[in-house]
Amino acid sequence: MSEERGVAAVAARGLFKQYVGGDGGVIHVLEGVDLELRAGEAVAVIGESGTGKSTLLHILGGLDRPSAGEVRVGEDMLWRLSDEALTHLRNRRLGFVFQFHHLLREFTAVENVMMPLLLAGIGWAPARERSRELLARVGLDRRFEHKPGQLSGGEQQRVAVARALIARPVVVLADEPSGNLDPETGERLHNILLEACRERGAAMVLVTHNRELAARADRVLRLEGGQLLPAHAAPL
């Protein structure tokens, strides 16, 4: 990679992932996947269910280890880090948005968003102020003190998006973030997520089944046969 282009926000090289099935056979999920994203770039990954899209995201986020290959976030090779250093990197430099929001139900919207900042050692008052500002940015300025059970599904996912972005991650990994939402709410959520990542200069990998929403990303790739291909490429 040239110095002129600089260091990628996240880069994967030669990723393989295999599992042993119940019958003892080997299941090949990823077969030499390469992927590189620059700061502020959004890449959508589409593909049939069971092709390994979520597995790829988990490996990029340091939540699962590849059978072979490497992942780099900035200058850091994930699998050369200690467990403590890897946890620190995930908390400070990566943001995760899943299909299920995983909000803490006993805490308010603003308290859920504050959590990453509090874990990073930021004081309560500045963490709360930053969280309120970001919740307002995603259209929840009247929902600061509502708990998840008092919010709609779309509102809960917007809280999850704010939580993913609050620590200003360099990479956001989003796995079907609108999968449980109606089309209109899902489209609104995707727009918020894309705009917020671009404004903050965060790279984003978005897994989605919705080709119309995927088309709004800078690139669209298809995971098929264990490989990432341009979405318009002929099937393997």
Show where each model-derived region lies:
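ABC-family P-loop ATPase nucleotide-binding domain
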Residues: 1-18, 229-236
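ABC family nucleotide-binding domain
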Residues: 8-216, 220-223
